[in-house]
Amino acid sequence: LLLFFPLHSIQAVQDVNEEVTNDLSGYSNKKHQSEINNVKYSKKNIDELGFILYDLIQQRDFDVINKIIDNYVSHKDHDKELVKYIYSEKAMLNNEYNLAIRLYNEILIHKPNMLLVELKLARALTYVKHYEAALSIYQNIKTKYSGGISSKLVEYIENKIIYLENKNRWQGMVKLGSSYDFNLNEASNSREMYCFRSKCMNSSNQSIAGGKWHYYIKSTKRFPLVGNHSGLLSFGAFGLEPMKTVTARKINIFISGGYQFENANTKIGILPIFEAKWHDNQYYNLSLGGKIATEYTLNHRVTILGDFEYKNKTHPHEYSFNDGDKWIYSLFGTYLVDSQLVAFGGIHGANREKQRNSDSYSQYGIRAGFLKVTGLCDFLVAVGYKQTNFEQFDVYLNVKRKDQNRYLNAQVTFDKNKILTFTPSIYFNSQVNKSTADIIYSFKQSEVGVNFTKKF
């Protein structure tokens, strides 16, 4: 569930006012005000107006700045670099990062040793995902101003260097867990019996309970190309080990790699897909295809995510009737209600073509929920509905199958309580599937489980 929306949205709001401006305001007031407002004027009132404008920048009071800056610029002795700095800060406030970057660079051409402007430039480059350029600036600052800046500022710069260096290192996640299905049963309340070619089956309300162990491993590496462009390689595995015979042993191995574009508010990935599956220690199928993943940040509150995926599935001879194509698509949005609450929702669907039209289907669904962050834990809830329509009448089932599935997912994550560096979480899943092929495919299921997750 956590894959359906970007959890960094909450953290971004919590951190947005702790960036360079707050960390450096006191430092810049003392050391760099005189550099930006180099007193070269013969008229005292212009000097004073320049200092007033700089103080207003520190207070982020652009309404007042807009009222007086025209008078300042109209004077022939105004400080052109101060004006550029004002416009660059205003551009940052309006998310016009490329304009701000251009103005910061123009200032540094004339005044190359302005620490505050260098830091602001590095921050702006990070916003537009020019990670390598931002890293180079921070490393240059660390060398150039070694011994001449406060310990707090040194710590800030070192943290930024570590953050940017990690962008091009292997990153991933390991998840270990266990779950228990405590009322997996058939949903039909009747004692129906269905017979076909001398073989019969009947409905039962007897619950089937059982547990399973599961693991998930994924690792991803970014390979910088130029500017906003990069390559991406990802691989991992998912496994399920049943405690009883309720479910089969499963192993999925996947590899993908391709191209990624990122800027301040857009991310686009084009990724080939290789996926192999094993069931009960036997090879089950191979999927080859590709995926287009997009993410667009409309503003600091709204993010839209869209995916389109294609796979061609091939099976061993005994399962070759499942060979065919699968298309998967989704469109989701997240809304940041406040610094501790994110709401999300969207639509998703799939089309599956198999050798038999009676096994081929189209599926569509809707999902909505929220994530609440508290001092004790993070609480995630999602509800959804999906409908699956099969293409043709199934002579074996004596019906044209149509399934309707309703589900609830809830998870509590104790992010501040590590166990051997792993983050614990508990979850509950419940679903009811109602099918026109009632005897076989209607069921109810409830599951409770625990996960231990480590990110690296």
Model-derived segments and spans:
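Amphipathic alpha-helical repeat scaffolds of TPR domains
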Residues: 44-51
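Classical Sec-dependent N-terminal signal peptides that target proteins to the secretory pathway
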Residues: 1-12
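Flexible helix-coil transition and linker loops at the boundaries of alpha-helical arrays
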Residues: 37-39, 71-76
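Short coil turns that delineate tetratricopeptide repeat
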Residues: 77-78, 112
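Gram-negative and organellar
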Residues: 12-37, 53-58, 63-66, 86-95, ...
